[in-house]
Amino acid sequence: MEQYTVTGMSCAACSTRVEKAVSKVPGVTSCSVSLLTNSMGVEGTASEQDIVKAVTDAGYGASKKGSKAAENTKNGSSAAGSSFGDEELLKDRETPVLKKRLLSSLVFLIVLMYFSMGHMMWGWPLPAVLADNHIAMGLIQMLLTIAVMVINQKFFISGFKSLFHKAPNMDTLVALGSAAAFVYSTYALFAMTDAQVHGNMDGVMHYMHEFYFESAAMILTLITVGKMLEAHSKGKTTDALKGLMKLAPKTAVLVKDGVETEVSIEQVQKGDIFIVRPGENIPVDGKVLEGSSAVNESALTGESIPVDKAAGDLVSAATINQSGYLKCEATRVGEDTVLSQIIQMVSDAAATKAPIAKVADKVSGIFVPAVITIAAVTIIVWLLAGQSVGFALARGISVLVISCPCALGLATPVAIMVGNGMGAKNGILFKTAVSLEEAGKIEIVALDKTGTITTGEPKVTDVICNKGVTEKELISFAYALEKKSEHPLAKAVLAYAEAAQTDIFEVNNFTALPGNGLTAEYENAVLSGGNYKFISTRTAVSQEMQEQSQKLANAGKTPLFFTKDDKLLGIIAVADVIKEDSPEAVRQLQNMGIRVVMLTGDNERTAKAIGAQAGVDEVIADVLPDGKDSVISRLKRDGRVAMVGDGINDAPALTRADIGIAIGAGTDIAIDAADIVLMKSRLSDVPAAIRLSRATLRNIHENLFWAFFYNIIGIPLAAGVWIPFFGWKLNPMFGAAAMSLSSFCVVTNALRLNLFSVHNAEKDKKIKSKKKVEDKKMEKTLTIEGMMCGHCEARVKKALEALPEVKEAVVSHEAGTAVVTLESAVSDEALKEAVEAQDYKVISVQ
């Protein structure tokens, strides 16, 4: 996605206009404009010149972001913070300008209000020269109003320019309202002068009360107040993104030929050697060559506990070296660093639009023309009803200035920006606004077992010694054997032995028998290690040890037997243990009304043991890597599905799911395929992400309700609909004040999300979700591998429906499933045999 900065936008109608203009450019596949950040994201093959021209022709300005940074990268020098240049773009320049305009306007407005209303309402004294000099009073009011209009000329330039381009915006409404009040007041001044010349005092008094100079000036000043408050609040919504950008180090200390040199971060290249002293920020992503330290990674992950780093470990830019001296090699620089990628994700998400925003966009596109029409009709109706021009004009002006398309346009993006920032602070990255909105609607969460529910690193859980054997002896011999093994479980045994500081000795004639075990010799004794099947051929295993082994296996652990000659030394159990927060995370998901399913390639016994520990609702075992995609397709029939995984083999399933969630410590492929990335690799962040999504969506609904409600109530009141019934009428000045506050209220409400605690489960509510198909409905779903076309579907359907118990079979080669409706009970084995007789493989039957 290419990012552009757009200038000249003032409301939702502007962003809609720009979006439509760019979307029509040949080669543009998608375009999303953010009024909040004055940015535009464009995808496609269209050239930069064509895109900028389309924006310019629409009456606005545009320039591509980061073009300098891109050039630097091309030349080989790369800025670790090329993305960080956007920090300047996010700087709040609008508030100081508006503040200056407001103060200048107030100086003239206060004087204007003194002359126009002070002496009439509160009896304030006037200079003797102005006493009963109505023409001079009118001229002073006109001149003071002109001063305020000149100060706020931006409304008129932008408003009438947009009207000229047939794309009226909020500035158009303000400009028309203020200009109408000024023009009519000027007419009244000349009419009053004419009456004065002809000695018509009744006419003089009549036209004097038709002055709306103070309304014209007050409208501009109050709208400026609202714009300033809105700009200040909007600036706060990007605090999280600006905070990330500020983390980027500005310099690095490089080492070359033993000489240390401090250079700017833009000069650091991949492969450079740099050093980091205690208390310093790590400048770029790298690999530790020398030294050890505790590194605070809270800036990236939100995890406050420092992580120990030593030679061979990876470090990331913007993390803090807390204790030791580190010498590192730069592995990722510029836009490739983890920090840059996080910033890019958050920035891209802000540049995309949530589906719910489309409603407001459609309304905003016709809102301003509709308001202008309503204002014109209001004036005509009141004139036809016999009211004066001044009265009718006041009602029309009130309609123009009370209407607020900005509140509609800001309702969604401000909440998305704040929600996204809150996620980034907590190590939860939403790639798009769509993922932030849709995550809260999830009904089923499918969890990969390894690395998601479990740590992904096997550990020794039990050490059971045979009679007459000490634990030290068992561990020492096991260590000697496993030291030369490349089996994944060997690492767990080695780590346990090293932690126990066991005796270390070397073995000879080491042999690894794939699928069976290990053998070696030590001081004329033969050492063996492996599974029960292998060891039982070498020595007798007592009933007690067999029962212990069975018990361990039932708990999802892998029992490893070790012998010395024909004597059994004992059993060491190894398991991929579940993460500490997994059971609580699963419980929280269930409390939110979400069904939790665990997917794994492990055998059913091991899978069910892990599933029971985690507390999941359903376990689907023996799923081959390419079978997860089919399982997700089946689950999607029961509701919206989120897939959580970390491996390469999870990527297809992450893409297939409604929402893909990647555990941050996983592979780049899984992260690329996901919609949400969890930086902390903590399962408890899954309910946190869903919780944040729901809170953001709730905030958007509140904002949209306020924006629609405000206009539905405000416009009829301004038009004078209630005057015949209750006598309620709205002065244009109060209409302008209401308009000013409406956008401010929407932005302020969105800022409340900053107070939201993503890990607080106390207020979780269950969603209404589709219920899982129960067994009593006599349906079973087969996940089938090998079907390629409609012919395959027909063969499987015919084979299944040939069974007397099967009423109907619905087969899909795309989903890789067959759903059978049964007349009576039938075994899973019978269904499996019927399909596999046609040369297809049944992965699972549910």
Model-predicted segments: where are they?
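Flexible metal-binding regulatory segments at protein termini and peripheral loops
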Residues: 1-136, 161, 259-260, 344-352, ...
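Conserved ATP-binding TGD loop and adjacent catalytic N/P-domain core of P-type ATPases
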Residues: 16, 29, 442, 522-524, ...
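Conserved cytosolic catalytic loops of P-type ATPases
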Residues: 26-43, 48, 210-211, 242-336, ...
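Juxtamembrane coupling segments of multi-pass membrane pumps/enzymes
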Residues: 75, 195-196, 201-202, 217-278, ...
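Transmembrane helix-loop-helix hairpins at the membrane interface
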Residues: 97-251, 362, 463, 727-732, ...
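Membrane-embedded alpha-helical bundles of multi-pass transporters
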Residues: 121-135, 164, 183, 422, ...
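Conserved catalytic phosphorylation-site environment of P-type ATPases
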Residues: 300, 359, 394, 407-481, ...
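P-type ATPase nucleotide-binding
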Residues: 460, 464-592, 604, 616-632
